[in-house]
C-alpha cells in the first residue's frame, strides 16, 4: 500500500504523537531534575515548564486515541488545537529569532526585575551580582561576594548567552511548528479517509 493510504496516514499520525509524548515527558523530567539538583529554585519557571509538558502530553494523548480509533470528534478537536498551537509557537519562534541585542537587553532586564528566585539562581550559577551594577546592601548568593575581588555584573555574562539561547529556542520552535502543521495536514487527510475494515454502509 502506498503512503497515501489509510494505514500509512494512521501510522504517521501515531508516530508524530508518540514524538510529542516523549517531548512532553522530557520537559516534565527536566523540570523535576532541575528542582531535585537545586539548579532551579523558581517555582514559576518550573510551573510553566511542567504546565507546557502536561499540555503537550494531553494533546498527544488526544491525537493518539483519535488516530488509533479513527474517532472523528477527537481528530477534529485535535486538528483545531494543533493549528492554534502552531500559530502561537510559530509567532514566538519568529520573535525569538528577530530580536536584536537592544531588545534582548530590555527583555532580560524586565525578567531580572520580576523574578527574584530566578535572579538568585543566575547569580549563584554564573558567579555574578546585580544586573548592571551591584548594591552591597542587596543579597547576593554568588561565591565572589566572599572573595576580595569585586563581583562582576550579570548583564554582560547573560548577554553573551542570550543570543545563542534565543536562536536555539527559535530554531527548535520552528522545527516543532512545522511538525505541527504536518500533523494538521495528516489529521485532515486521515479524518476524511475511510477505514477499509469498517462496515461499508457506515457513515464516515
Swiss-Prot record:
Q: Which UniProt keywords apply?
A: Glycoprotein, Membrane, Phosphoprotein, Transmembrane, Transmembrane helix
Q: Phosphoserine-modified residues are where?
A: 143
The protein's topology relative to the membrane is: Multi-pass membrane protein
GO cellular component assignments: membrane
Topological domains annotated Extracellular: 41-44, 94-167
A Pfam family this chain is assigned to = Tetraspanin
TM region(s), chain numbering? 20-40, 45-65, 73-93, 168-188
Q: Does Repressor appear among the keywords?
A: no
Give the record's family classification.
Belongs to the tetraspanin (TM4SF) family.
> Which protein is depicted?
Tetraspanin-13
Organism whose genome encodes this protein = Bos taurus (Bovine)
Amino acid at each position: 500500500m502506498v503512503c497515501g493510504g489509510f494505514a500509512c496516514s494512521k501510522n504517521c499520525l501515531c508516530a508524530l504523537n508518540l514524538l510529542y509524548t516523549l517531548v512532553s515527558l522530557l520537559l516534565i523530567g527536566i523540570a523535576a531534575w532541575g528542582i531535585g539538583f537545586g539548579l532551579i529554585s523558581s517555582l514559576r519557571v518550573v510551573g510553566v515548564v511542567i504546565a507546557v509538558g502536561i499540555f503537550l502530553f494531553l494533546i498527544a494523548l488526544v491525537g493518539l486515541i483519535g488516530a488509533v480509533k479513527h474517532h472523528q470528534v477527537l481528530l477534529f478537536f485535535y486538528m483545531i488545537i494543533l493549528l492554534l498551537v502552531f500559530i502561537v509557537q510559530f509567532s514566538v519562534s519568529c520573535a525569538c529569532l528577530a530580536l536584536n541585542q537592544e531588545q534582548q537587553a530590555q527583555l532580560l532586564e524586565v525578567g531580572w526585575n520580576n523574578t527574584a528566585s530566578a535572579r538568585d539562581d543566575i547569580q549563584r550559577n554564573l558567579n555574578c551580582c546585580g544586573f548592571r551594577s551591584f548594591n552591597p546592601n542587596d543579597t547576593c548568593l554568588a561565591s565572589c561576594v566572599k572573595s576580595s575581588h569585586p563581583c562582576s555584573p550579570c548583564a554582560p555574562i547573560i548577554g553573551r548567552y542570550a543570543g545563542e539561547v534565543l536562536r536555539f529556542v527559535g530554531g527548535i520552535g520552528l522545527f516543532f511548528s512545522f511538525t505541527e502543521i504536518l500533523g494538521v495536514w495528516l489529521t485532515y487527510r486521515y479524518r476524511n479517509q475511510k477505514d477499509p475494515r469498517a462496515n461499508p454502509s457506515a457513515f464516515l
